Design a protein with these regions (language model features):
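Short, acidic, metal-binding catalytic loop of nucleotide-sugar glycosyltransferases
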Residues: 29-38
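Active-site donor/metal-binding and catalytic loop motifs
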Residues: 231-249, 262
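Glycine-rich, basic loop-to-helix element that forms the pyrophosphate-binding segment
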Residues: 69-87
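N-proximal low-complexity "stem/linker" segments adjacent to membrane-targeting elements
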Residues: 1-30
Length: 316
């Protein structure tokens, strides 16, 4: 919902995308309609319409994507680092382009960041069960799409930690809306806040991870190694629905490369659920106890990839 007494806060919102402009525009609509807006929104993106970007009452800084690879692949970690380097504020909130922010997300997460300035804080996602209609996207841009509608259209991911719905209304009792955790594997870079000093201390996202998988877990493991506290919060975002593959065999190559990179660095296997599924499909030979690099045994056929495609799934 739009707010008459909207605040502007000294925080930079950073997002990056390619080929997902409908989601990007919805994200910008939600930011513009929130109770408080960031003083700048940094978009690492090459293909969005500058005239459309100019239509939002936000200070938007668009910077071009760059890739660490020579083949021009979209490297989300590298692009997040570019966004952080371009940020004018010390406080930074990173959002996947799939996000819509709740009315008070920016205001509440920023306030919590100011009270925990040396920590890593992550928000709470809900998952839309279908894409927004054109009418709903228009209402969102007009500040007329109620959060009750987004709550009705969304669900929680039962495989991740979730706050109860009651906790969303208990911002005044902060003990119920923020939890210090040692489970750094629960970190997901969909929606998180961090100050520049801690981001630099971590080293940003490791750009040795190419393509899909493990770069956010690596980021969290480095935070843990450095003693940076990690908080889960009930600050709410809505993940816009898009098709997925179950299992993610369309990303087999990059998942294996990144899993090997992660194990070499941390002596721990990330993405064990996916690796287990790949092993059951005889695509790889892998067990949680192994210490040797994973090798691809079989490549999925196009028919296999199409069979794994789930166009209506809310999450992987």
């Amino acid at each position: 919902m739009s707010h008459l007494n909207q605040k502007t806060l000294p925080v930079s919102v950073i997002t990056t995308c390619f080929g997902r402009n409908a989601h990007l525009y919805n994200l910008l609509s939600s930011l513009a309609a929130a109770s408080a807006v960031p003083s700048e929104v940094i978009i690492v993106n090459d293909d969005s319409d500058k005239d459309v970007l100019a239509s939002y009452p936000l200070t938007i800084k668009q910077i071009p994507t760059k890739s660490t690879a020579t083949d021009g692949r979209f490297d989300i970690g590298c692009n997040r680092n570019l966004g952080a380097a371009a940020a004018s504020n010390e406080a930074m909130i990173f959002l996947d382009v799939d996000c819509l922010v709740a009315d008070d997300f920016i205001e509440s997460l920023f306030e919590r960041m100011t009270r925990h300035p040396t920590a890593l804080l992550m928000g709470q996602p809900r998952y839309l069960t279908r894409p927004l209609s054109k009418i709903e996207s228009r209402q969102l841009k007009q500040g007329k799409l109620a959060m009750a509608t987004l709550n009705r259209l969304s669900i929680l991911n039962p495989y991740r930690f979730n706050f109860t719905m009651q906790s969303y209304d208990q911002k005044d009792n902060d003990d119920k809306g923020i939890i210090l955790t040692q489970d750094y594997g629960a970190f997901w870079s969909l929606c998180f806040g961090i100050y520049r000093d801690q981001f630099k201390q971590i080293g940003g996202f490791d750009t040795a991870y190419i393509g899909y998988g493990a770069e956010d877990t690596d980021f969290a493991f480095m935070a843990k190694k450095l003693g940076i506290a990690f908080y889960l919060t009930n600050d709410l975002v809505y993940h816009q629905q898009h098709s997925v593959h179950r299992p993610s065999i369309n990303h087999l190559n990059s998942i294996v490369v990144n899993a090997n990179r992660f194990y070499q660095k941390w002596q721990h296997w990330p993405m064990s659920g996916w690796l287990s599924e790949f092993a059951q499909l005889h695509l790889i030979e892998w067990s949680a106890a192994q210490s040797t690099a994973i090798k691809i045994q079989n490549t999925p056929s196009q028919a296999d990839i199409e069979a794994a495609h789930q166009p209506d799934a809310p999450f992987i």
